């Protein structure tokens, strides 16, 4: 068992598992409320690598496949449940699939990137996009593996207790998790520092991938990857106050472990 004394002051999985390239990847959910699928699929991809022999398994678990085919997960582009995403991976499996416009994996993402609360060349995001159709075949015609042979699975799915230390041990031992928090109107314009909600109304829940933790000027934080592309926030990531369930960030942490054939 770890005591708080044994836990490092800061932890970044990109330094502990440098071979796992997915840890550096920031996705773009586009004009679709699919954050729940991205938080899950990106952490699943990280864990597929972290738990593989010599970190050799470099795959992107497909958010597209999860978003379009997990009917028990909620409402597709209108929101979903992180815990259900992990149990779907365990029960049904998910194929591979990378970013929009790539030939990466069986089912790459089909919703195009857009600007999330920042000015740029991609055009502003419009919420409430249509959920893509579920297909049990590889949409990427240049991919040579059959759908059923491409499926990756979780061996189990679980919730992490709402406890700072338990979450830290989970991140350090098994890799990034999915989490969720309440977004207030003072969050979307975040650029740097440790986010703490001060003012503004609640805009809704948002699921993300928790990477690690640290301290900035004495303030403890979680290091989190968002799915709003690299030009949002701090190169696509943000820091949020750690240790007081700020905006509910510690209350909905879910994860799972990969299964290898």
Residues covered by each model-derived region:
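Catalytic-core signature of thiol
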Residues: 1-261
């Amino acid at each position: 068992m770890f005591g708080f004394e044994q836990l490092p002051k800061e932890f970044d999985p990109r330094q502990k598992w440098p071979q796992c390239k997915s840890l550096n990847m920031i996705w773009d959910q586009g004009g679709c409320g699919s954050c729940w699928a991205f938080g899950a699929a990106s952490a699943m991809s990280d864990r597929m690598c972290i738990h593989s022999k010599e970190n050799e398994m470099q795959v992107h678990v497909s958010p597209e496949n999860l978003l379009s085919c997990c009917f028990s997960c909620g409402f597709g582009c209108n929101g979903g449940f992180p815990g259900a995403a992990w149990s779907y991976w365990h029960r049904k499996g998910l194929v591979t699939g990378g970013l929009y416009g790539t030939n990466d994996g069986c089912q790459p993402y089909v919703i195009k990137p857009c600007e999330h609360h920042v000015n740029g060349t991609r055009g502003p995001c419009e919420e409430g996009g249509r959920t893509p159709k579920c297909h049990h075949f590889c949409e990427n015609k240049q991919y040579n593996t059959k759908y059923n042979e491409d499926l990756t699975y979780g061996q189990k799915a679980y919730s992490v207790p709402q406890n700072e230390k338990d979450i830290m041990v989970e991140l350090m031992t098994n890799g990034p998790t999915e989490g969720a928090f309440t977004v207030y109107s003072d969050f979307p314009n975040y650029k740097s520092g440790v986010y703490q909600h001060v003012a503004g109304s609640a805009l809704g829940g948002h699921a993300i991938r928790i990477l690690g933790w640290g301290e900035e000027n004495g303030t403890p934080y979680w290091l989190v990857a968002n799915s709003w592309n690299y030009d949002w926030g701090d190169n696509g990531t943000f820091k949020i106050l750690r240790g007081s369930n700020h905006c509910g960030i510690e209350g909905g942490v879910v994860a799972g472990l990969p299964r290898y054939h």
